[in-house]
UniProtKB/Swiss-Prot annotation:
Gene that specifies this protein: atpG
A GO BP annotation: proton motive force-driven plasma membrane ATP synthesis
Family label: Belongs to the ATPase gamma chain family.
InterPro entries for the chain: ATP_synth_F1_ATPase_gsu, ATP_synth_F1_gsu, ATP_synth_F1_gsu_CS
Superkingdom of the organism of origin: Bacteria
Record's subunit section: F-type ATPases have 2 components, CF(1) - the catalytic core - and CF(0) - the membrane proton channel. CF(1) has five subunits: alpha(3), beta(3), gamma(1), delta(1), epsilon(1). CF(0) has three main subunits: a, b and c.
Presence of keyword Cell membrane: yes
Membrane topology label: Peripheral membrane protein
Protein name: ATP synthase gamma chain
Length: 294
């Protein structure tokens, strides 16, 4: 009977755990939908800024913003690493950190040192364990990222590039593909290339940008401001995609945990039933044996 009592305790414990994981799955599903909406809402802004910047760059070919000038001679590279603040999201952080580590080794193989910006506590902890140079960080963004919280940390990397101190700035994050699939991505953020300004419509055509603007105070000042806003929008978009990926990965992980808990409960219930059956059979045998002796 002591064994049966222990099994009942295990069943109760797993049932309580399943209630928690089921609740977390439902919360993650709700947060995932909101994160996807924010991710989709951020895209039109970045697209419009890109269209205007492309138009102005073509209209003023003699001017090249520092973000579009190569700093190949610099011996340092910058990287903005976007991860989550919390765990329980499967292998999402592990995958992007593994890809980042490979990029670090690649850059170090080229004789470059790394100056990193961490967005998220998991990435910050990873960089600290590597003893990497962290020039800025932002953590505890919550479930709703705000651009103003990111600007300060991102600006450090933009200033390093503008001053020619880093050869390139890379952006590492987890791209949202669909609910069941998220993939680690490392993109070159700076220098900007002409290809980044060639946006394609869904039918594969290039959108028309034949506009006539009057610039105040002048086109150069507007381009300077626009390109900074464009790069900030790219980072915000990456953070929004990372958060959508986080909630999707957490929902899938909690569903797997709930399903596994159900399997464990069924197995324990089977063991309990067998133990109970054996105990009843033993008692009946003792009763029958006692009656026969009388």
């Amino acid at each position: 009977m002591a064994g049966m009592k222990e099994i009942r305790g295990k069943i109760k414990s797993v049932q309580n755990t399943r209630k928690i994981t089921k609740a977390m799955e439902m919360v993650a599903a709700s947060k995932m939908r909101r994160a996807q909406e924010r991710m989709r809402a951020a895209r039109p802004y970045a697209d419009k800024v890109r269209d205007i910047a492309a138009h102005m760059s073509r209209a003023n070919p003699e001017y090249r913003h520092p973000f579009m000038v190569s700093n190949e001679g610099a011996k340092t590279a910058g990287i903005i690493l976007v991860t989550t603040d919390k765990g329980l999201c499967g292998g999402m952080n592990t995958n992007v950190l593994r890809a980042s580590l490979q990029k670090f080794k690649e850059l170090e193989g080229q004789g470059k040192t790394i100056e990193a910006t961490a967005i998220g506590t998991k990435g910050l902890g990873f960089l600290n364990r590597l003893r990497a140079k962290v020039v800025s960080n932002v953590v505890h963004l919550g479930d709703t990222p705000h651009l103003e919280k990111l600007i300060g940390a991102v600006k450090v990397q933009l200033d390093l590039y503008s001053e020619g101190k880093v050869s390139a700035v890379y952006l590492a994050y987890t791209r949202f593909v669909n609910t069941m699939k998220q993939e680690p991505v490392i993109e070159q953020l700076l220098p900007l290339s002409a290809d980044q300004f060639e946006r394609k419509e869904e039918d594969g055509t290039t959108p028309s940008t034949q506009w006539d603007y009057i610039y105040e105070p002048d086109a150069q000042a507007v381009v300077d401001e626009l390109l900074v806003r464009y790069v900030e929008a790219l980072v915000y978009q990456a953070v929004a995609e990372n958060m959508a990926s986080e909630q999707s990965a957490r929902m899938v992980a909690m569903k797997a945990a709930s399903d596994n808990a159900k399997t464990v409960i069924n197995e324990l219930q089977l063991v309990y039933n067998k133990s109970r059956q054996a105990a009843i059979t033993k008692e009946l045998s003792e009763i029958v044996g006692g009656a026969a002796a009388v």
